[in-house]
Amino acid sequence: MDNKLTDFKIGLTALGAFLSSLLGILYVPVLLMVACNVIDYITGLVAAHYRGEKVSSYIGLRGIIKKVCLWLLVVVGAIMDTLIKYAADTVGIKPPVHFLIACIVAVWIICNELISILENMIDIGVKIPPFLLPLVKLLKEQTEKAGEPKEEG
């Protein structure tokens, strides 16, 4: 049994190292995003039960497809980052950070997921600290502002 646990830990560490080397700065946001996706999906199912709503495999599949589409938004951000880096490299500019747009997209998605998780918890009957939901909403707003063009003046 101890051998299997050790093998599992080694495999998990190797997977983490591989993903970290592949994603770089995106590793932590993507990991958090996927964790939030799973938690939101589970709390959403439980909250639907508490609200007396019928949950079907079709509704569940739609939720999963939505989560996968959210992952694709990060891919779109990464593609934009890669294009910008390629264009900058072409003219001799070295951007200090790669995957900036993708990181902002991932943080925005994480904020949306956290809002949904907290709302699901409220529907389940969990008492949450009164400052938590407004704080997450503020972080989401700040993330949205980070992606907006700055006005010169």
Could you say what each language-model-derived stretch is?
Residues 1-8, 94, 111-153:
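Membrane-proximal cytosolic segments adjacent to transmembrane helices
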Residues 1-22:
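Short, strongly hydrophobic alpha-helical membrane anchors
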Residues 14-18, 45, 75, 79:
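Alpha-helical transmembrane segments of multipass membrane proteins
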Residues 33-40, 70-78, 105-116:
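Alpha-helical transmembrane segments of multi-pass membrane proteins
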Residues 22-29:
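Transmembrane helix interruption/hinge and helix-loop junction motifs
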